[in-house]
Swiss-Prot record:
Keywords: Cell membrane, Disulfide bond, EGF-like domain, Glycoprotein, Hydrolase, Lipid metabolism, Lysosome, Membrane, Signal, Transmembrane, Transmembrane helix. The lineage of its organism: Eukaryota, Metazoa, Chordata, Craniata, Vertebrata. The keyword RNA-binding does not apply. This is Post-GPI attachment to proteins factor 6. One of its GO terms (molecular function) is phospholipase A2 activity. It comes from Mus musculus (Mouse). The gene is Pgap6.
């Protein structure tokens, strides 16, 4: 089982020799030189590492950092060394959480949100430690006898404060995380063959065996016979069967400490088609020899496969539709009874072949070959094998839906179903707990009062999964002898459940070649599939937010009117551009029902940011009172520079503030020049300062302070609306008076609205008579 430990001094990166030394120190010291050499010859060490990643504060699954490792077979010891560094000594001491899981990415819930109904959500195995603790010590996680295959680590910082940070305005701190994996595996492993006794002798070091479990194994009996000790009577041996998995571990341990020379371990439904690790350890004192004989006995049954051949024989004149492809009850009982008399043994299950159809990335559909229905009997379970073993199926959500007609399940009958990994559950006649040798399955039931059951499995483990169903009559078993229930199965793998609903967005995430999915929620909705509405906005709140963010842009009508009145036609055009695209960008940016997008979201966002920067640019240049030609050139060049900087980094604050600061320098230089040239302060009127410049500067300062330090995800809709009002209001106050030679609405007077008689000065070339 995993355990957290510390050792060594702080390191930015550990060398391979140091890592190997740490791994070797984790093992007990040798009892004898000869035995140590013999043990060292059968063990090899390997080291794996991945590129470091920058951690983020947790808001949804996409803000975590995923690491994917593959543990080789026959590994007896695994150690993760967790390295953390910071980008600056001034970084705060944050808590770092690391989750571990075998077979699939960990299912985590740092925010404590609710999952959808019938969703499996086991607590993940994780460790938490402060940054200072991780940097002072080499924090490690050790796992004995880990399961071979895919292992996943997920690391993140504490939940975010929901504050909207402006990139580049406030210095950020980088927290870098890198795990190293060290394994020690056995290269000399004896194979325990079925029904063949294998003598073993233990001294100080364990003995490692492996057993191959064939398909359709009902039971495995592991026996220790003739166990003797050189000093004391009894059998001081501990047997560990299976591998360690996280977050749930189903390793089986047998301790033979009695006086009897034999003991055994019985495993029901062991994992099919794979090697099973067995470790024998001596519990006697050092230098005490323990000898015994190990033996594995299998109980194997035969499956009855429902194939197309059987279906054709039972229904020769019918087509393959849902109603026609049904296995006759009498034919099943007749064939099973005739075949069970063969010497090869009785049937233990009814096997339904399954068609796997890959439809998209992390999208698979399963369907029985004979249609969507499965016939469920009381004599034996009906089993479907669901292959989720490609290594790319563990990044989505696996949904299982079972349905039956209300008339087929009576009050005294019950359809019991179990979903298990590695091997199916076959013991419905004795228990309904869905427990196999190394896995706790997930039960599902169909009753007269509930004719539908569903199960949602986020991030299913990479394995062969089995769905087994059987008809059970707890009160009167004789009622089930001739009964057959037809169950409809809907089995599919999708990236996100219901595509994260109306208040979420399903996003595909990638770590090297591994693809997984997560839900990004909006409008206050939270949870794994954006179904937790504990902090959600109501429809009225959503509409109010949309109206505030869009209608607040009408404040730009004031600077537009003032610009036209003072003959600033270019400035009025820029303000209108900003008002138009800011309005429709925020109409498209809303979650839920209040959404209106006239262009793509990315285009609207770019135009909104460009309008904000250009509005500030033209306002400051207008205040500088430059000559017309120079002013027009700077207006065009500045807008082009802002457009280029937004293309490079749209959310970088200095990409917008840089050109605006340059414009402010130009304005300040012109004002200082006029002050020196005229011998008095510019602008000269105190009314201009008191009633226009100071209010405009105050509104701009408050708006910038609010934009950079006060916005959060919760108050965004009204703080950003105030930002719109302050930005437009400051532009209206800061615009300078019109030129002395220009009259009011002079630009509009250039567009006459009446007829004019024009004199034709061209010469007549010819005359028409």
């Amino acid at each position: 089982m995993g355990r957290v430990g510390a050792g060594g001094t702080a390191r930015e990166a550990a060398t391979g020799s140091l890592l190997l030394l740490l791994l070797l120190l984790a093992r007990p010291p040798p009892a004898a030189a000869s035995n140590s050499k013999e043990s060292e010859a059968g063990l090899v060490s390997e080291h794996f590492s991945q590129a470091p990643q920058k951690l983020s504060f947790y808001s949804w699954y996409g803000s975590t950092r995923l690491f994917h490792f593959r543990v080789p077979p026959d590994t007896v010891l695994l150690r993760w060394l967790l390295h953390v560094s910071q980008g600056s000594p001034s970084c705060t001491d944050e808590e770092i959480t690391v989750h571990f899981r075998y077979g699939a990415p960990p299912v985590i819930n740092p925010l404590g949100t609710s999952f959808p109904d019938n969703t499996l959500s086991h607590a993940s195995f994780h460790i938490r430690a402060l940054l200072s603790t991780l940097m002072l010590d080499n924090t490690s996680v050790n796992i004995s006898h880990p399961a071979p295959g895919d292992w996943f680590l997920v690391a993140h910082l504490p939940p975010s404060s929901q504050k909207i940070q402006v990139k580049g305005f406030v210095p950020t701190c980088a927290y870098i995380f890198q795990p190293d994996m060290l394994v020690m595996r056995v290269v000399e492993v004896s194979t325990l063959e079925p029904d063949v006794p294998l003598p073993q002798t233990l001294l100080s070091y364990p003995s490692y065996l492996k057993i191959f479990v064939p398909e359709y194994t009902q039971e495995l009996r592991l026996e220790l016979q003739g166990c003797v000790s050189s000093v004391s009577p009894g059998c001081p041996v501990r047997v560990t069967v299976g591998a360690t998995t996280l977050p749930r571990n189903f390793q089986r341990v047998l301790t033979c400490t009695g006086l009897a020379p034999s003991c055994h371990l019985l495993l029901s439904s062991p994992p099919w088609g794979r090697w099973l690790q067995v470790t024998f350890e001596s519990l006697a004192e050092p230098h005490v020899t323990v000898g015994f004989t190990a033996k594995a006995v299998f109980t194997v049954c035969r499956p009855w496969s429902v194939t197309i051949h059987h279906l054709i024989q039972n229904n020769p004149n019918q087509t393959y539709d849902t109603s026609a492809i049904q296995l006759s009850q009498s034919a099943v009982h007749r064939d099973l009874g005739r075949s069970s008399r063969v010497d090869s043994g009785p049937f233990c299950l009814l096997n339904y072949p399954v068609l796997r159809e890959d439809t998209d990335v992390v999208s698979v559909h399963f369907q029985p070959l004979n249609g969507a229905f499965v016939l469920v009997h009381s004599s034996m379970p009906s089993v479907m094998q669901l292959r989720l073993d490609t290594g790319m199926d563990s990044g989505g959500s696996f949904i299982i839906v079972l349905r039956t007609n209300k008339t087929e399940v009576t009050n005294g009958t019950l359809v019991a179903a179990c979903v298990n990994a590695a091997s199916p559950f076959l013991s419905f006649n004795t228990s309904l707990n869905c427990t196999t040798a190394f896995f706790q399955g997930y039960p599902m039931f169909l009753r007269a009062s509930s004719h539908m059951a569903n199960l949602i499995m986020p991030f299913p483990e990479t394995d062969n999964w089995y769905l087994s169903l059987q008809l059970v009559c707890p009160e009167s078993p004789e009622d089930c002898e001739q009964a057959v229930v037809r169950v409809e199965t809907i089995l599919y793998l999708v990236p996100c459940l219901n595509d994260c609903g109306p208040y979420g967005q399903c996003l595909l995430l990638r770590r090297y070649g591994y693809v997984y999915a997560g839900c990004s929620c909006k409008a206050g909705w939270r949870g794994w599939s954006c179904t937790d509405n504990s902090t959600a906005q109501t429809v009225a709140q959503q509409r109010a937010a949309a109206l505030l963010l869009t209608l607040s842009n009408l404040m730009f009508l004031a600077p537009i009117a003032i610009s036209l009145h003072r003959s600033f036609l270019v400035e009025a055009s820029v303000y209108f551009y900003t008002m138009f695209f800011s309005t429709f960008y925020h109409a498209c940016d809303q979650p839920g029902e209040a959404v209106l997008c006239i262009l793509s979201y990315d285009t609207l966002q770019y135009c909104d940011f460009l309008g904000s920067g250009a509005s500030t640019w033209v306002t400051i240049l207008c205040m500088a009172r430059l000559k017309t030609i120079l002013k027009q050139v700077l207006l065009v060049l500045g807008t082009l520079v802002i457009a280029m900087s937004l293309q490079m980094d749209r959310r970088g604050i200095w990409n917008l503030m840089g050109p605006c600061v340059f414009a402010f320098v130009i304005m300040a230089s012109m004002w200082i020049y006029r002050c020196g040239h005229r011998g008095q302060c510019y602008p000269t009127s105190w009314q201009r300062w008191v009633f226009y410049l100071l209010p405009g500067i105050s509104m701009a300062s408050v708006g910038i302070a609010m934009y950079t330090s006060m916005m959060t995800s919760d108050n965004y809709y009204y703080t950003h609306s105030i930002w719109h009002i302050l930005l437009a209001g400051s532009a209206a106050f800061l615009l300078p008076p019109r030129e002395e030679k220009a009259g009011s609405w002079a630009c509009l007077q250039k567009f006459p609205c009446h007829y004019q008689i024009c004199r034709n000065d061209r010469d007549e070339l010819y005359t028409v008579t």
